[in-house]
Amino acid sequence: MDAVTHCTDSHSPTERSPWSRRRIAEKLADFQRLDSPWISARQIAQQIDVPDRTLHHWVRRQRTFLRNNSWPPDTTRFFESPRGVDFLHRVVTAAHLVFVQANDCGLRNLGWFFQLSGLDQFIARSYGAQQAVAEEMESLLIRFGQEEDQRLAVQMPSREITLCEDETFHPQICLVAIEPVSNFILVEQYQPQRDAETWNQCASVKLAGLPVTVCQVTSDAAKAIVAHAEVHLGAHYSPDLFHVQHDTVQATSFALASRTRAAEAELEKAQRHTATLREHHDASRGESSQNPLLPVLEQHVQRAEATEAATRQQLRTCQTRQERAQAARQGLGRDYHPVDLQTGQPLTSDEVGHRLAGHFDTLDQLAAEAGLSAHARDKLAKARRVLDSMQATIAFFWTMIAARLAAWQLSAPVEQWLRQDLIPAYYLRRAAEKAATAQERLRLRTLATEILARARSPDGLWGTFSPDRQADLEGKAQQCADFFQRSSSCVEGRNGQLSLKHHALHQLTGRKLQALTVLHNYAVQREDGSTAAERFYGAAPRDLFQWLLEHLSLPARPRTARRAV
């Protein structure tokens, strides 16, 4: 006879137990270790500091659970042990973090997962129970983000940053601002308006506690964002290249394509007409070579062939215009760089401006030749108006580098070496990561490697530096290469993600949006294992999942079946 049979009180506690599930598992493990025929349950309860009524209830519940559970006894004992409770807690936390918070899985589907896995015999899978877990985790995610933002900001080194800004609609207005190098979200919140004052307020709240200076804002040409950047932040406005190219596509692509399709239809019509006349001509000649209609038919065939040739030439002209327009549009992206992507040589703002102007001139010429509508020409004019800002962005890039080099107090040869070799090499590396094709990525990486090899020649300046000095200069060169930001694609991509989540959930609350921001900044990792927060603050944050394990409530037990009355 074991000790629990000597317990005099067999009733369950009527009050809700203040004991955590893991603590109960620890006490039951202590009981199993001390249990013997020579010691009573009351004595064991005193030794492990648990009321004897409570201990008896725990033991009886565990034994009933072991008898009624469909899992093997050893598996059930494991899940009832402290380590088993920890495992269940880890599974529930991971499931909610990955399935519910990050990937929009419904709570009923999550309960289904627990049912199919058999874990519903150890954890409560009801909608209400899992809703409580989801709400608690959402609150914890927001709390973690706030605490880590404050903690990491204290030790963050001061620096200048770029912001990419844009709005999206759910249909509520959602303002989004991201630091593009780290991909860290600074602003992501719903607001009733999207004017400059609203942008100023949102950015000021976030930037107030950070040792950063916004020196550049990349976005579309929204007047509110431009005013916010130039007036409130005192930053340079860098136009987003995508919107410039988008205007040129709207102006030329569809119109020229429709003319090509029309020319193709005319050519097919002319070919059918020519073929029909040839059939009549051949049929008439077959009937009689002296047919007086043959000369007339021959003239008709000749005129049809001439018309077909002219139509074919018109089609070639339309196709050539399309190809030239596409090349000009692509040329805007190819040449809008402070470094020549073919040679790796630095380019001045005037050189870049001249190249870009040539592409705009080509598009204007094609519009005139094709007789495009006034609306199309207005679109081209709108895109061309951004040329000055694009050229100014190149000048801003080199001005910022000059200011950095002056602040670092480098010698003239070292400054020249950084400008001509090291900075362009690292810029080409970044351009290679964003190239459209594998062939272009390989070419740019190869060119960057060649320039880096030249810059690191032991016979040059590189050979005169210590290893620490070499690492420091390479870090400085990478910082300089990051100054040029011509695209707000990081924000556009984030807006697309939010649209998909809004479509799945039908509504994104302010709290849910905050939780998603924290997941983006502190959970999503790149291939090197770094998070956006680590790249932005320059220090590793606490592990989000481990923090959730420490703060999220342990999973509740499933409700026991009610006794029949």
Pin down the residues of each PLM region.
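Basic, short loop/linker segments at the boundary and entry of helix-turn-helix/winged-helix-like folds
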Residues: 9-29, 53-100, 128, 158-159
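RNase H-like nuclease fold core
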Residues: 79-243, 248-345, 351-359
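Flexible coil/turn residues that form the inter-helical turn or adjacent wing/linker of helix-turn-helix
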Residues: 36-37, 103
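Short alpha-helical "recognition helix" segments of helix-turn-helix
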Residues: 40-48, 110
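Conserved small-residue motifs centered on glycine
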Residues: 340-343, 347-451
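C-terminal domain-tail junction helix/linker
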Residues: 420, 424-435, 439-468, 473-488, ...
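Mobile genetic element proteins and their domesticated derivatives, centered on retroelements
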Residues: 27-30, 55-58, 110, 166, ...
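Charged alpha-helix within mobile-element recombinases
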Residues: 268-303, 316, 320-323, 327-330, ...
